[in-house]
Amino acid sequence: MAAAAAAAGAAGSAAPAAAAGAPGSGGAPSGSQGVLIGDRLYSGVLITLENCLLPDDKLRFTPSMSSGLDTDTETDLRVVGCELIQAAGILLRLPQVAMATGQVLFQRFFYTKSFVKHSMEHVSMACVHLASKIEEAPRRIRDVINVFHRLRQLRDKKKPVPLLLDQDYVNLKNQIIKAERRVLKELGFCVHVKHPHKIIVMYLQVLECERNQHLVQTSWNYMNDSLRTDVFVRFQPESIACACIYLAARTLEIPLPNRPHWFLLFGATEEEIQEICLKILQLYARKKVDLTHLEGEVEKRKHAIEEAKAQARGLLPGGTQVLDGTSGFSPAPKLVESPKEGKGSKPSPLSVKNTKRRLEGAKKAKADSPVNGLPKGRESRSRSRSREQSYSRSPSRSASPKRRKSDSGSTSGGSKSQSRSRSRSDSPPRQAPRSAPYKGSEIRGSRKSKDCKYPQKPHKSRSRSSSRSRSRSRERADNPGKYKKKSHYYRDQRRERSRSYERTGRRYERDHPGHSRHRR
């Protein structure tokens, strides 16, 4: 037993001194200047056990106090959270080192964050899960959630019911993962802890008391109980180990060297020993508190903070606007002026632009209106020409093929007269004779022919013939002498038409001999 204890003490003394950084510090101490690489000086990060000790100003005024929690409520929350971590570690069968690491991380975190803004139970779960991975005894996050669920049922004295895998479970799991990340961020990822358990065994070997099992076990118990206090963020691990041995020896009435005091050999002072012992003894004198009552106090502070923020923004807790007490309140609604009326007599540029457009449109409408059957202006002339052209085109499209062949000359002549009237002067065209039939029926007929179910091929030839006749009439109007020389132009055109009819007739007889016999 003594050999094993000596080996453990030697291993503990040979361990490196690198450990977790102080919460919120994350940098090098004030004495370090940095790291010199070449000609440049870079800032360095020094990770030692001194970084995990908090200064007195942070210990006196914590973030929970700034949120409105009193000191007793904060102390009770710290104790209850550490008790939950210890009980969950026992049910998860974690080693004692892992449970101690989780409690130290819990204490460090809540010296940088408030109990009002962060759930104590969620942070406890996150610390258990993180400590199990740090001490190389990982546990699944589902097991951690089930264990804490079971502890809550035992605390409320309810019948044990398994946790359902519903959306609430998924949300709780995500909250624990976020809490774990938050703990790592606040501690600067410096989460290693140097525990005094091995130091106790080594010091008892030096005092030649390692064979007293009762003294060793009592000192170990005081060490585990001190994890529920904040002594691990106030004092060095060596001082805590000396205080646990001192308190156990006084409790068991075992004399230890006092001239000089034995703890001076290990670098501890009498003031530190007495303060640590007092913290541990206060833990036993504390009354048992109800977690539900503590959670209610935290919720009250949350609501008070939310109301204060809402009043600072000028809103009620429901989000409604606060009414001004100085102005008289009348139940009748106030008439709010439109933005156009509120701007005054000066019109906006957009309204001026719209007014100009309306005036221009009215002028165009007056210019287009016919007076005594004659349209006004050049624009009206061009529109009347386009209408006459459309009216003259529509009958040709709806006409039969035979009629189209006979009327080709007349259409070309009409277009010729139109082109001549355009080129000679800008005088308004003559009014159409009143005896002429209404052309709306012809337009309807052309529309019906267009909407026919089975389109026919002659429609294409109609559009081509009309376009060709228009182009030919324009050529004749531009070059009248060219067509006067060719007196045989229309005669040749009639011959080509007769030949084309003869060709079609022969092809028809060749394809259908019976029909040719019937004609004969």
Curated annotation (Swiss-Prot):
Alphabetized UniProt keyword annotations: Acetylation, Cyclin, Nucleus, Phosphoprotein, Repeat, Transcription, Transcription regulation
A molecular-function term among this protein's GO annotations: cyclin-dependent protein serine/threonine kinase regulator activity
Major site of localization recorded for this protein: nucleus
GO biological process terms held by the UniProt record: regulation of apoptotic process; regulation of cell cycle; regulation of centrosome cycle; regulation of RNA splicing; regulation of transcription by RNA polymerase II
Biased composition (Basic and acidic residues): 357-367, 376-390, 441-454, 472-481, 489-514
Region of interest called Disordered, as start-end residue ranges on this chain: 316-520
Domain of life assignment: Eukaryota
N-acetylalanine PTM sites in chain numbering: A2
Modified residues (Phosphoserine): S330, S338, S348, S351, S369
Subunit structure: Interacts with CDK11A, CDK11B, CDK12, CDK13 and POLR2A, the hyperphosphorylated C-terminal domain (CTD) of RNA polymerase II. May form a ternary complex with CDK11B and casein kinase II (CKII). Interacts with pre-mRNA-splicing factors, including at least SRSF1, SRSF2 AND SRSF7/SLU7.
PANTHER family assigned: CYCLIN (PTHR10026)
Protein name per its UniProtKB record: Cyclin-L2
Organism listed in the record: Homo sapiens
Biological classification of the source: Eukaryota, Metazoa, Chordata, Craniata, Vertebrata
Gene from which this protein is expressed: CCNL2
